[in-house]
């Protein structure tokens, strides 16, 4: 399609990233660990590095992806950790929005509609900004991202095999990393 040039994709992705950064600006300018990011994920992972920490339960479930992210991010210098936690949460929401721009979705909706949906995902206010700025709430963008990847139409041509393998790897990671995938996977399949 004419609208879907590589330059257009890059500009839209950049615009989505800027919109997401504007939304998270207060947390980026005055970094602090939100809620359980500090009380649980930072406190449990900063003092020592233990791979077993990725299986530590939180709020009645085991968020493997969040635990792994916190474990790795807590190896950074202490002043960078709050910003790194916010950026990790932002990357997950950016992944959701970016998935809608992939060429496979042209079978579902025109490019302009998908661009509007991607911007809407990062601009429309949810209950709070915690979904965009807190690792403790990262299961929600992870769940949405997994759902979008599972619902993504398969491409008719085989020339993008590496892309499909990467997509499958991301689906497997998100399914393992997110405890809510047990509820979501049957809906997407």
Regions found by a protein language model. Give the residues of each.
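Membrane-interface micro-motifs in multi-pass membrane enzymes
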Residues: 92, 109-155, 176-177
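Membrane-interface junctions at the ends of membrane-embedded or membrane-associated helices
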Residues: 1-6, 153-166, 189
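Transmembrane signal-anchor helices characteristic of membrane glycosylation enzymes that use polyprenol
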Residues: 6-33
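Membrane-proximal lumenal/periplasmic loop motifs of glycosylation machinery
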Residues: 26-34, 47-75, 79-89
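Transmembrane-helix motifs of polytopic, lipid-linked glycan transferases
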Residues: 87-110
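Membrane-interface alpha helices of multi-pass inner-membrane proteins
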Residues: 163-187
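Juxtamembrane "helix-exit" motif on the non-cytosolic side of transmembrane helices
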Residues: 26, 73, 99-105, 123-134
